[in-house]
């Protein structure tokens, strides 16, 4: 804290008793004597007014209680980069030598920060530092030009999140001294970005990862700055209130990951503006209020030219409630992984199974690998579940008579393909099951592992409507054996010694006349 004010005090980021704010006013506030700073708090609940006092407006706040007047001597204006770096990383013989180290992420890269507990003699020398974290160190400026480059020229990864940086120009003054800079996290610095494209320099010529979460940047400002990031691969823009206002032309063309999560102004029409980034593989759209998406260039069963390289899509915590959303995702030519947790659509027990059936090339769902037998089961169940609807809409096992309606094909774009893959559902499969009656439909069966004589014979009660596929799934969990390796047959208590194979996974136990007291034989 100091009574000496910076020359450019208006717009400066400051910290007061652990709370962060931006200086909006400096001067007298009559009738109280002395110098005052008018600040707008990041947390509006911390303030008392909207920037006015006794009828006079001294500055404006976005929130009616976002402002306060404070004395300069209680305000922390921060310190330069190198001073903060030395405080954190230079080895000392003081009582706090055993400060903890911590693990953090800068973009998708895991970084082990160097606490005093892990510092070696070599690492204590600033020149040897490569990955650093100055999180919450009150860094506000670059300091004397050239000193950073001289003291620590080998830094590649920098976490400057939650500091007191005020402008993008100040960031440039730091970055231009780090010639090998690859990853930079500036999250939670309320930065003033240039309103026009800055002069192109080589400042960020090696930068691959840039994190700008909660910085207040707009999409227009992103595009103004982007030409200065020629090799950028990962860009994080979470929680900025961003609206995508224009298509990136000659900018962000090397981008592989884009995080737009928690920007509720983004909708499906805006996503079309970033749909032709040629190398975009990962797109993070969690918590933006998304409910629909549409790729108008692709008909049913065709692939879109939009998002050509997209392999991983995250749409957690949105408002997705219609299966048409999932149908559209099957049009993405490269999509292999999807995360869509905590959406209205995914609350049902069968939701994940239906998603697997609807998106043919999907290999990972909600961070879980989709095994071949799981896909087969999901597709067979889907084919059976909508078989009656398919028949009513004009579907037929005879190819010459198979003419399902356009409405059905729109709702179930992959159904015809599944019929080609597994065959059309048979009449027996589509019969309505009789109402469940516990007394005559619950079978008590013995389960014997034929090629594992040491295995104890089990006894289970199973519904006679349970399909062979579901029985295999149950046995797979009980015996810790993959479903694909299980072979099932049974011996009837009425015909000892005769073994009947259960070869059709889609048929229920009752189809094979399995009865109470019979024995299921399991091999693998």
From Swiss-Prot:
- Residue span(s) of domain CAP-Gly: 27-71
Which Pfam families does the protein's record reference?
CAP_GLY (PF01302), LRR_9 (PF14580), Ubiquitin_2 (PF14560)
Q: Which InterPro entries match?
A: CAP-Gly_dom_sf, CAP-Gly_domain, LRR_dom_sf, Ubiquitin-like_dom, Ubiquitin-like_domsf, Ubl_TBCE
Q: Which GO terms describe its molecular function?
A: alpha-tubulin binding
Domain LRRCT per the UniProt entry, residue ranges? 343-381
**Spans of the LRR repeats?**
154-175, 180-201, 206-227, 231-253, 254-273, 279-300, 309-330
Q: Which UniProt keywords apply?
A: Acetylation, Chaperone, Cytoplasm, Cytoskeleton, Leucine-rich repeat, Phosphoprotein, Repeat
GO CC, any one term:
cytoskeleton
A GO BP entry? adult locomotory behavior
Q: Tell me the residues on which Phosphoserine occurs.
A: 492
* Residue positions, PTM N6-acetyllysine: 460
Where found, per UniProt? Cytoplasm; Cytoplasm, Cytoskeleton
Superkingdom to which the source organism belongs: Eukaryota
Where N-acetylserine occurs, the residues are: 2
What does this protein's UniProt record list under function?
A: Tubulin-folding protein; involved in the second step of the tubulin folding pathway and in the regulation of tubulin heterodimer dissociation. Required for correct organization of microtubule cytoskeleton and mitotic splindle, and maintenance of the neuronal microtubule network.
Q: Spell out the subunit comment.
A: Supercomplex made of cofactors A to E. Cofactors A and D function by capturing and stabilizing tubulin in a quasi-native conformation. Cofactor E binds to the cofactor D-tubulin complex; interaction with cofactor C then causes the release of tubulin polypeptides that are committed to the native state. Cofactors B and E can form a heterodimer which binds to alpha-tubulin and enhances their ability to dissociate tubulin heterodimers. Interacts with TBCD.
The record's annotation in PANTHER family points to: CILIA- AND FLAGELLA-ASSOCIATED PROTEIN 410-RELATED (PTHR18849:SF0), LEUCINE RICH REPEAT PROTEIN (PTHR18849)
What family is this? Belongs to the TBCE family.
What's the protein here called? Tubulin-specific chaperone E
Protein species of origin:
Rattus norvegicus (Rat)
Instruction: Please name the gene that encodes this protein.
Output: Tbce
């Amino acid at each position: 804290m100091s009574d000496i004010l910076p020359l450019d005090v208006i717009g400066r980021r400051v910290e007061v008793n652990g709370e962060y704010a931006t200086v909006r006013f400096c001067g007298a506030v009559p009738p109280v004597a002395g110098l005052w700073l008018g600040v707008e708090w990041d947390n509006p609940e911390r303030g008392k007014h909207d920037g006015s006092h006794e009828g006079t407006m001294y500055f404006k706040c976005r929130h009616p209680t976002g402002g306060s007047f404070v004395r300069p001597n209680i305000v922390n204006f921060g310190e330069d980069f190198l001073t903060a770096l030395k405080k954190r990383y230079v080895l000392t013989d003081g009582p706090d030598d055993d400060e903890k180290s911590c693990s953090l992420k800068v973009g998708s890269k895991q970084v082990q920060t160097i606490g005093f507990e892990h510092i070696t003699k070599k690492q204590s020398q600033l020149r040897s530092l490569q990955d650093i974290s100055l999180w919450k160190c009150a860094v506000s400026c670059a300091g004397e030009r050239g000193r950073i480059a001289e003291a620590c020229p080998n830094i590649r990864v920098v976490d400057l999140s939650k500091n007191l940086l005020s402008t993008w120009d100040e960031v440039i003054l730091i970055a231009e001294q780090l010639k090998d800079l690859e990853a930079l996290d500036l999250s939670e610095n309320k930065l003033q970005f240039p309103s026009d494209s800055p002069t192109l320099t080589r400042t960020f010529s090696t930068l691959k990862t840039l994190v700008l979460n909660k910085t207040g940047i707009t999409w227009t400002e992103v595009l103004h700055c982007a030409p200065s990031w020629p090799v950028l691969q990962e860009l994080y823009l979470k929680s900025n209130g961003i609206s995508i206002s224009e298509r990136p032309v000659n900018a962000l063309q090397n981008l592989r990951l884009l995080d737009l999560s928690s920007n509720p102004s983004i909708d499906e029409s805006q996503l079309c503006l970033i749909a032709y980034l040629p190398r975009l593989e990962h797109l993070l759209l969690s918590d933006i209020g998304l409910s629909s998406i549409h790729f108008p260039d692709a008909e049913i069963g065709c692939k879109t030219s939009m998002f050509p390289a997209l392999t991983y899509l995250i749409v957690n915590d949105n408002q997705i409630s219609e299966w048409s959303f999932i149908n559209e995702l099957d049009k993405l030519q490269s999509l292999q992984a999807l995360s869509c947790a905590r959406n209205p659509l995914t609350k049902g027990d069968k939701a994940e199974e239906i998603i697997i059936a609807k998106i043919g090339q999907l290999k990972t769902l909600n961070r879980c690998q989709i095994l071949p037998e799981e896909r087969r089961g999901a597709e067979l169940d889907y084919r059976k579940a909508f078989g009656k609807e398919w028949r009513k809409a004009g579907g037929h096992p005879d190819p010459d008579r198979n003419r399902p309606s356009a409405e059905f094909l729109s709702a179930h774009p992959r159904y015809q393909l599944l019929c080609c893959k597994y065959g059309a559902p048979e009449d027996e499969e589509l019969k309505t099951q009789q109402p469940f009656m516990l007394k005559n439909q619950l079978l008590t069966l013995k389960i014997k592992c034929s090629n594992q004589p040491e295995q104890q014979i089990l006894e289970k009660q199973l519904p006679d409507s349970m399909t062979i596929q579901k029985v295999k799934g149950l046995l797979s969990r009980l015996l810790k054996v993959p479903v694909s390796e299980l072979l099932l047959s049974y011996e009837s208590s009425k015909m000892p010694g005769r073994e009947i194979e259960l070869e059709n996974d889609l048929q229920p136990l009752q189809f094979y006349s399995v009865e109470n007291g019979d024995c299921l034989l399991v091999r693998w």
